Amino acid sequence: MKTPVFAFALLVAAAHADPRRSGFDDMSASTQALQRDDTLNPALLWLKDGEQRFTSLCVRCHQPQAMRGVATRYPAFDSRLKRPVTLGERINLCRTRYLESKAWGAENEEWLGLETFVANASRGLPLAPPADQRLAPFREQGRQLFVQRLGQLDFSCAQCHDQNAGGRLAGSLIPQAHPTGYPIYRLEWQGLGSLQRRLRNCMAGVRAEPFAYGSAEFVALELYLMQRAAGMAIETPAVRP
């Protein structure tokens, strides 16, 4: 028989349970199985390619084991640019600054693979956005974008993913939209894609003109979304419908 103290502790724990849900929690068992089993995960090809690319390009400066935890703290402030940069942009900056190579373009397969490898090193770790005060105005910009109505349908991110999360839109479940698994493999895409690709899809869905890849708006929005998901575990490479 449970003691009153133990029962009270259970009630307190339930009251403080994290209401946030990963998109993984809402997927079918078959799609969850694809993500759980690395040998079945369709993003494996990109992950392996990223590992090879890291070995050939990055080990002169970085050891693979040092990548553990890196993805948990992006976007981060770049002192030279005086603005936040995403993990993908940091990789591209390393490419141009130190390898003196041409920057990869949006959704480049090699770039996605390398970012997947770096982010995968932090799989299972909680997102830990930096407390750097220089990020505060950019994060606030992202919050404002999240609640701003856009497009001909006059919808905001918050309307779908805060107010109506768990409901359905055109037959599809509306997720809470926590960016815990990017780059992700979407079955709809039959390929790997970045968070910005997904955000552009959402904007097109409400009939708004999508921001450009790499835009300040997308970086600010990602900064806010990562703060919103702080403490949730990284899943990269996640699989979604």
Named regions from a protein language model:
Residues 2-5, 12-46, 75-140, 166, ...:
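Post-cleavage N-terminal segment of exported redox proteins
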Residues 38-65:
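N-terminal, post-signal-peptide region of Sec/Tat-exported proteins
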Residues 50-52, 147-151:
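Short, flexible, mixed-charge glycine/proline-rich loop motifs
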Residues 55-65, 114, 142, 152-164, ...:
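The canonical Cys-X-X-Cys-His
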Residues 68-71, 167-170:
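Short Cys/His-rich "knuckle" micro-motifs
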Residues 151, 159-165, 177-187, 193, ...:
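C-terminal cap of thioredoxin/glutaredoxin-like
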